[in-house]
């Protein structure tokens, strides 16, 4: 939790309380349903919460922004981002119902009114979004195929509407069909060794490819 406060010093008291509650909530749920790797649960704030918040170092979401989190799993990156940006709407989806039930319970416990969670495939989602976020659920070409018709036409941010993707390693081959993609090294923001090879990838997408 100290790392969150270090890198995001302007949190309100409510946000601090919400972030503090995450550990007990996920410890409790993980004992019932394995939504987070057993070896990672003790490093929840670094490997899941702070990792999710790396997106916020690239783009601060304006009020009224609509964000889709594809393959959210236990609620990452969506839940931490929803705490940080209470005036942004987040739609968290996954194909596994038990994970969505955990996300719904966590959002309810934190009283996150800006979160909707649903079991649904990305291809079947209705609506248009400013940004689509995810944590390495598949390779980028396949991911773009899932969500390419779900981007809003009007931009309200410095970054163009599109994908903000958390992934690591050498992405040269994976991104070769996306010349406007840009990689941001998370290690430039967070010093922990865990982030040494981790990146946020921004892929701008035109409306209705």
UniProtKB/Swiss-Prot annotation:
Keywords: Cytoplasm, Methyltransferase, rRNA processing, S-adenosyl-L-methionine, Transferase. It comes from the Bacteria. S-adenosyl-L-methionine binds at residues 71, 76, 122-123, 135. Its EC number is 2.1.1.-. It is an enzyme of class 2 (transferase). InterPro entries: rRNA_ssu_MeTfrase_G, SAM-dependent_MTases_sf. GO terms for molecular function: rRNA (guanine-N7-)-methyltransferase activity. GO terms for cellular component: cytosol. Pfam families: GidB. SUPFAM superfamilies: S-adenosyl-L-methionine-dependent methyltransferases. It is found in: Cytoplasm. NCBIfam families: rsmG_gidB. Belongs to the methyltransferase superfamily. RNA methyltransferase RsmG family. Specifically methylates the N7 position of a guanine in 16S rRNA. PANTHER family: S-ADENOSYL-L-METHIONINE-DEPENDENT METHYLTRANSFERASES SUPERFAMILY PROTEIN. This is Ribosomal RNA small subunit methyltransferase G. It comes from Flavobacterium psychrophilum (strain ATCC 49511 / DSM 21280 / CIP 103535 / JIP02/86). The lineage of its organism: Bacteria, Pseudomonadati, Bacteroidota, Flavobacteriia, Flavobacteriales. The gene is rsmG.
């Amino acid at each position: 939790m100290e790392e969150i406060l270090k890198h995001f010093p302007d949190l309100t008291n409510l946000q601090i309380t919400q972030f503090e509650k995450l550990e007990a909530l996920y410890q409790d749920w993980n004992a019932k349903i394995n939504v987070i790797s057993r070896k990672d649960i003790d490093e929840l704030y670094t490997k899941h919460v702070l990792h999710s918040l790396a997106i916020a170092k690239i783009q601060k979401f304006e009020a009224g922004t609509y964000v889709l989190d594809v393959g959210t799993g236990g609620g990452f990156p969506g839940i931490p981002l929803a705490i940080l940006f209470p005036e942004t709407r987040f739609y968290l989806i996954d194909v596994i119902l038990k994970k969505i039930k955990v996300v719904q319970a966590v959002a309810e416990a934190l009283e996150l009114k800006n979160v909707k969670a649903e079991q649904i495939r990305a291809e079947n989602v209705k609506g248009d979004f400013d940004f689509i976020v995810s944590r390495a659920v598949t390779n980028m070409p396949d991911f773009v195929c899932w969500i390419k018709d779900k981007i809003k036409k009007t931009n309200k941010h410095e970054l163009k509407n599109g994908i903000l993707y958390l992934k690591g390693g050498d992405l040269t081959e994976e991104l070769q069909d996306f010349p406007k993609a840009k990689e941001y090294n998370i290690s430039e923001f967070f010093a922990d060794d865990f982030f040494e090879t981790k990146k946020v990838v921004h892929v701008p997408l035109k409306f209705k490819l």
